[in-house]
């Protein structure tokens, strides 16, 4: 019998899995939901996402009923405000949202940049730290928040709707911009006051492996699961992957996908203005993270725009060739790799080509994208070293199915060993052992 029913909820789909430790016994087909992009906005309909969760679980069939607990791994931030009945007053606003630049500036200016970093562990990055989103709604849609009884991230929403509990974990709390991330000792009165909100509408923070609550009868009927089934509080998807990688101090975990996320595990967090610092979610460990917001998505954007007649296999072959060969002699084209903005900056940069001439070819443009991305990947290592945690030389790598990880690690200085891990988020959930509060 599977011990855990795992739910991996990303920015476009939900996968449910039956887990026995780190073994995946079965997985559902992906249940997709739509993220609405409008300018700098990125929103998900909460009811549509909840329906996708139910679809994924039911995709496992009768076996899903024979588990001991449910465990969650979610995208983050995914901010939402709820009323007294647990109904959403706002859309779920995801980490891809960039509408709140002005609000981010205001939060940092009022409290001071150094003070915010020292309290929260991060600067108030638009969308990446959800206090900026909360500030935007307070200013632009105050009516939506007048009846707010609970405000949190996706795991809080799921618990409120499925178990009736009001909980979150330290990894999610870290990215609210309101939590004492570096000490893990609760919500910060100073940060809440800076935003102008009350701690009363915030969830209780407990470790990710703590049972947040049991499924209500209504939720059990909707999901096809037993009423009362324990649901763990859950954690961020990247934390689940780090657990599978070992979560040892100095461990690097690199998720190479549409976004490229490089995380360092530490027991002594040292905030840096160009890094995201957050709790692991269990125990007293933290992750310090550097992110390229558009990695594979930048390459496949180039395929759609410049090489629409090429097959995927031909395109990937050319990526490898260009990576080995480098730019042609005399080529002056350069690429700034910010097609999806920058996760660790308040002022949002944009992607750009420079050095174009009448001799520039589409191959030059693709080569420039590769060079810009590989350089940006390598430039993250000095930032992580600056935290004072010694980096282990074996890097756990997830999401490298297209072998883009080899491309992205090309310019890393020194000797490294790369250890592929598959299904990292789902398998990491299987390592959480349920415990009572």
Model-predicted segments: where are they?
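N-terminal glycine/serine-rich phosphate-binding loop of ATP-dependent small-molecule kinases
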Residues: 1-91, 102, 220-221, 225-233, ...
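Active-site core segments that coordinate phosphate-bearing ligands/cofactors
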Residues: 5-6, 15-18, 101, 108-124, ...
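A generic structural motif
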Residues: 30-32, 95, 293
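Short glycine/proline- and charge-enriched loop/turn segments
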Residues: 32-36, 172, 279-280
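Short beta-strand-loop/turn "lid" adjacent to the catalytic site in phosphate-handling enzymes
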Residues: 62-95, 120-128, 159-180, 204-208, ...
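Structured loop/turn residues at beta-strand edges in well-structured enzyme cores
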Residues: 65, 200, 389
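Short, glycine/charge-rich flexible loops or terminal/linker lids adjacent to PRPP-binding catalytic cores
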Residues: 97, 213-218
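A conserved helix-loop-beta module that forms one wall/lid of the active-site cleft
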Residues: 195-207
